[in-house]
Amino acid sequence: PGERRFNGRLARQLLGIGVPMGLQFSITAIGSIMLQSANNALGTACVAAFTAAMRIKMFFMCPLESLGIAMATYSGQNYGAGRPERVWQGVRASSLLMMVYWVFTFAVLMTASRTIARLFVDASETEILNDTALFLHVSVSFFPVLGLLCILRYTIQGVGYTNLAMLSGVSEMIARILVSLLAVPAFGYIAVCFGDSTAWIFADLFLIPAFAFVYRRLLRMKRPDAAGPAGL
């Protein structure tokens, strides 16, 4: 009976963790919509290339997202067990795995992006295939930046500092909006190709010092109830 009783403190703590995580995806999506809208003004060829490239990019991004999700669980467990020093070990190990995966993905997309694009684009559409390949070549070159973003963001979320993780999504949104409003009208499709990578860089510029701040706090806290992080 006691376990089924409503616990206001626990509910507030769960909401403090869950709501920022949900808002983060909404905030990031706003920037992506802005970038797509800017690309739509460049013509049908750019729209088709962007659509095909995004499908392929999202497929190859899945392992990076999975690494991040694994780090959220790993860091949360070790934080709860009073072993925060292992969080840094996990970040280093997952970063190594990420770089190994990037080498493989870089080789595949730099050599076979046009071939893969033919799953979505007719072989006769040379311009669209070229634009799709250009987008993928730029994106995969910055996958280490994206991988670090996923690892650090989910690690920070895993130990309860969800508001800081959400702010990295705000950084991404700002970067994509700036690219959409300033760079795309001036430089065209090539600016669209660099839109995501610019957002990833902006997010990492926030996440790296944020993780350093969080990790230093973790080392000073022996137990997770020593100072509740959910409000940060």
What residues fall within each predicted segment?
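Short alpha-helical transmembrane segments in multi-pass integral membrane proteins
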Residues: 1-19, 75-142, 183-232
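Hydrophobic faces of transmembrane alpha-helices in multi-pass small-molecule transporters and flippases
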Residues: 3-34, 39, 59, 63, ...
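Conserved active-site and cofactor/substrate-binding residues in soluble primary-metabolism enzymes
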Residues: 9, 21, 45, 51-54, ...
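Hydrophobic alpha-helical segments typical of transmembrane helices
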Residues: 10, 22, 34-35, 46, ...
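Helix-terminus/linker motif at the lipid-water interface of multi-pass membrane proteins
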Residues: 26-55, 59, 77, 115-125, ...
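Small-residue-rich hydrophobic transmembrane alpha-helices
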Residues: 49-113, 146-168
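Short runs within selected transmembrane alpha-helices of multi-pass transporters and secretion channels
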Residues: 65-68, 139-158, 164-179, 192-208
